A protein has these predicted regions:
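Glycan-processing catalytic domains of CAZymes
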Residues: 1-125
Length: 125
C-alpha cells in the first residue's frame, strides 16, 4: 500500500551551505540525509549550489532513501553533468532523476536555447 510520505521530496544542500544567510544566524551541520530522516521524507533532491561535493560519498549516505535526484542545471551546456549522473545511477539504483533547478544568475544573462535540452530526456537505463 502506498503512503503519502512516499511522495514527499526534500530539497537537500551540503551541510552548512546556508549558515549566516537568509536570516539563519546559527550554524547547521545537519546533512541532507539527516534532514530527510528528520522530516520523514523518503526522497531527496540534492542541489550542491556551487559547492564542490564528493558525489559518491553523498550517494553512499543516500542508500536508505527510496529515490534520489541530483541537480543537473548545466547538463544542456555540458553533457558531462548528465553522464556523471548516469554513471552514478549504475552503482546507486535509487538515483531516479535529474533536477533542473534555478535558471538565475549566470543563466539569466546567458540563457541556454530550449533545443539544447531536447536530447537530455532520451537517455534511458
Amino acid at each position: 500500500m502506498a503512503h503519502l510520505r512516499d511522495r514527499f521530496w526534500i530539497w537537500g544542500h551540503p551541510e552548512g551551505r546556508y549558515n549566516h544567510e537568509f536570516g539563519n544566524e546559527q550554524e547547521s551541520r545537519m546533512t541532507p540525509l539527516e534532514g530527510a530522516l528528520y522530516m520523514g521524507a523518503r526522497n531527496l533532491f540534492m542541489v550542491p549550489v556551487g559547492v564542490n561535493v564528493n558525489v559518491r560519498q553523498y550517494n553512499k549516505s543516500f542508500t536508505p532513501l527510496k529515490s534520489v535526484g541530483w541537480a543537473i542545471d548545466n547538463a544542456a551546456a555540458d553533457p558531462a553533468a548528465l553522464n556523471q549522473l548516469i554513471e552514478q545511477a549504475k552503482d546507486y539504483p535509487n538515483i531516479t532523476c535529474g533536477v533542473f533547478d534555478d535558471f538565475v544568475g549566470y543563466l539569466a544573462t546567458h540563457p541556454i536555447p530550449p533545443e539544447r535540452f531536447g536530447g537530455i530526456g532520451c537517455v534511458a537505463r
